């Protein structure tokens, strides 16, 4: 353990030293000394020295406006470098990779040792693997793209420096390169000046594909194949690629008026353009590699006399020409030019696959398997994973937008007001129209701009090549008519295929009603005929936690999934559960392996579909090696969950969870909704108001510009509490409920649940992680600096609650301290705290200065505003999750 961490610590201190030299060169010795003093005070304050803690507070309060920005940037940049070192550590032979034997191999060995599982059963489970990762542009990726590229390069330098055999001059060159990169980062503005547009967000997603996933996916499949051969003597079929990527960037219009039908059309074209660009590079390599002459009669017949001399090259050059023509056409379309489709335009994956696979089969048959299984195999697998669209997109829209559109239409037609009809009347109307052969939309109707936008979006879906749009997600879905309405709007747009439409259940009530809604839908003959035995349902994690608190929400999510699984099984429907998890605990984020094994039995039978959000995309897929490791973790967890499902739930455990849910929800809502002091306290004790100024994502932070906590999106709500280190949404109510059940004499039952039920142990583990990142003295400091004295008692009450919660969680888990079973995470948090604490203290000071100036009617000082943005980004890096 220590030896492993000494490698990480030495990398962190080396990067810190280089950053120090950069600061000295840029700003002079006195600023570096100031930063060093603050760092030492912070370290000593963390070790429990109260006098130094006091001195730390005074030093930061007394910084002049000119010193604010350099100090904030120094600690913020250091945390980015520490994250980079930690990311490298997770894949380094000296780091976790060394002590973490291959996860797939470990899972396969575990499965082979189960007497009830035959090798054939395991093979079948592998063949039915399905993993779809949905990349979302949540405004939580704070770091600018240009800095991410520099950090990827820093990572590459660390990798080369790890090589024992490099010559001195190479070592010196690498160190010089590191110094250049860190200096470039220091002299780059880390805060975006403008909000990214939805197209910028989509380009960020494509950059992740190009820089990491393009290489990572074939590498992961090689790894998987190797482990299967070694452990089961089984080779993966060439066409078997269990992983797909979908994106919400450019498709998610829920609450984001900037995502229009035109934007979606543009992003679809851009995505296809990027795919042709990446495949052209692959094909170029194959043109130069596949110079072989010997080929099967089938391949020779395919190329004819013209290509007989170099049949493989001939096919590759043909494919290259088609890709170039396709790219030129897409480029013209992106510029707004309307050109006729060229001959050979690539629109379907088969058109890419067939010539490549013909070469593959011929090479195998002619004894050149070693060549077939090289770059050619990687390209074939990319065709299966990415294909012509590169990444498919989901469309997401709020249910009320569809209801309003149909209301406007029925009023125009003079048949009543759809919006005011009962659910039964709505369903009768929708089913009648869905069965009707005549169109419903009148030709000369001029709808409102909002309705026009909904109809235009359906038009874009109908026109897009089949397979480029993955699903239509309806947020805030509450009734069967919400789902039928979308099917009707798509039918009216002339869609020629059955598009998966997924209701998203995201509040406590909606989760509790989800099974009733789906049962009603599955009882409609027309609907059963349409879906052809497949249904997708999305479970919302973030909004349910904001609505009811984390304990009640997670139990409602579990029960909704459990009921849906049983209903679909009974109806013979293959259910895909789509998990809308976030990066942070308050939004359902948990280490992937633990989270998947804690779901109800059978929940992964239809594969895993999960959102990967904002900043988590970079932590989990930022480098090809990390992509391999993340995909392997998911693979191991899905196989284990499907083949060794957790036992059916004990009735007594269910009763305890019901009780915990009611108590925790009442306490949570008692504070968040009913305590009149809560919203003013939240607004002053956190940077919630100021977060709106950060140009993070293309989507507004609020659903409605006025209003309390309920109108805030889940992300800024959690982001704000993470900044002041109280982490309130991720624990409020949970500990109090546990304490009440302990007082009722059920502690031993809770301990058994913690031991034997993955769902419950994961909940407690997530609470421990939150408590380890929370910090009560810092939360108290925010109160003292920013909150009206009349509200101090509320802050104290909340902090006391957290202290009590920590005690009860440790008692049930039988641990003496937090994170006892994950010492490396505890170590990582401690390492960061030394750098995050000064940013927190500084942030409270900056908020104080900024609000003071506003109160006095002064213009905000740009130095204060800029430094505030930097502390927000820095604390997010220190906490390793934002919203």
Swiss-Prot record:
Keywords carried by this UniProt record: Carbon dioxide fixation, Lyase, Magnesium
Active site: 138, 546
GO biological process per UniProt: carbon fixation; oxaloacetate metabolic process; tricarboxylic acid cycle
Cofactor(s) required for function per UniProt: Mg(2+)
Chain segments annotated as coiled-coil in the UniProt record: none
Enzyme Commission designation: 4.1.1.31
InterPro entries: PEP_COase, PEP_COase_bac/pln-type, PEP_COase_Lys_AS, PEPCASE_His_AS, Pyrv/PenolPyrv_kinase-like_dom
EC category: lyase
Gene3D superfamilies named among the record's database cross-references: Phosphoenolpyruvate/pyruvate domain (1.20.1440.90)
Catalysed transformations (reactions): oxaloacetate + phosphate = phosphoenolpyruvate + hydrogencarbonate
NCBIfam families (alphabetical): PRK00009.1
Database matches in PANTHER family: PHOSPHOENOLPYRUVATE CARBOXYLASE
Function: Forms oxaloacetate, a four-carbon dicarboxylic acid source for the tricarboxylic acid cycle.
Protein name per its UniProtKB record: Phosphoenolpyruvate carboxylase
